[in-house]
Design a protein with these regions (language model features):
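Surface-exposed loop/turn motifs in large extracellular/passenger domains
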Residues: 1-90, 94-222
Length: 222
């Protein structure tokens, strides 16, 4: 569990790996859990790579869980946060307990990945505001077999600086946008939403727009 602030400086060419595993065969298990308002900071002066990973197997609950407001910050180097699920558990889940802020300095990157190899729940489920700040880049990628790649409900993508790319890939529906979804990208920034479905079923789509989705300065790719 990550509580408070986790700060790291990783030198250029070096790698810091932090991995949590939930091996429960029953009940609720979380691979990597963030407590309220937790922050992970890859500090300036490094230039290396930081990988955080949460892994769940059969019977577990969530690979990476951010239940409240949180911050991921990369000021020098690249950060990857990955949820892996081999069961019906979510690979990456963030509820509506506050905004998730992705802060990247120019030349730095944050990549969120949810990878799921079984049916059940979606690879990534986000129910909150995603704030992208800082001049660098960030991406959110959900890859699923048997369910939706990325499920969003009642969410705002708010890109005030830099670029954010949202990618959903599935053998069912790539990205499912439910309820009111707001998209915003400031001048000079890019918000790309890309959904890919390998299914031939008429009920599946690259991006499924359910209701009331609106945006400005945004690109949608199917």
């Amino acid at each position: 569990q990550i509580g408070g602030s986790l700060n790291a400086t990783v030198a250029t060419g070096s790698l810091l790996n932090i991995t949590g595993r939930a091996n429960t065969t029953g009940g609720l298990g979380i691979g990597l859990n963030f407590s309220a308002s937790a922050a992970v900071n890859l500090l300036a002066g490094g230039g290396g790579t930081m990988n955080l990973q949460g892994i769940v197997n059969s019977g577990a609950y969530i690979g990476v869980f951010i239940p409240n407001a949180g911050t991921l910050s990369a000021q020098s180097g690249n950060m990857t946060v990955t949820g892996n699920s081999t069961s019906n558990a979510w690979a990456f889940y963030a509820t509506n307990g506050g905004a998730l802020t992705l802060n990247t300095a120019a030349g730095s990157n944050i990549d969120i990945v949810g990878n799921k190899t079984a049916g059940g729940n979606s690879a990534i489920s986000f129910w909150r505001t995603i704030n992208k700040v800082g001049l660098g880049n960030a991406s959110i990628t959900g890859i699923s077999q048997g369910n939706v790649g990325i499920f969003n409900s009642g969410l705002t993508y708010n890109v005030t600086a830099g670029n954010l790319r949202v990618i959903g890939i599935s053998d069912t529906t790539g990205i499912n946008l439910a309820n009111t979804i707001n998209f915003y990208a400031a001048a000079g920034s890019t918000l790309s939403v890309e959904g890919t479905s390998t299914s031939t079923a008429s009920t599946d789509a690259g991006i499924n727009f359910n209701t009331n989705n609106r945006g400005r300065n945004c690109n949608f790719f199917r």
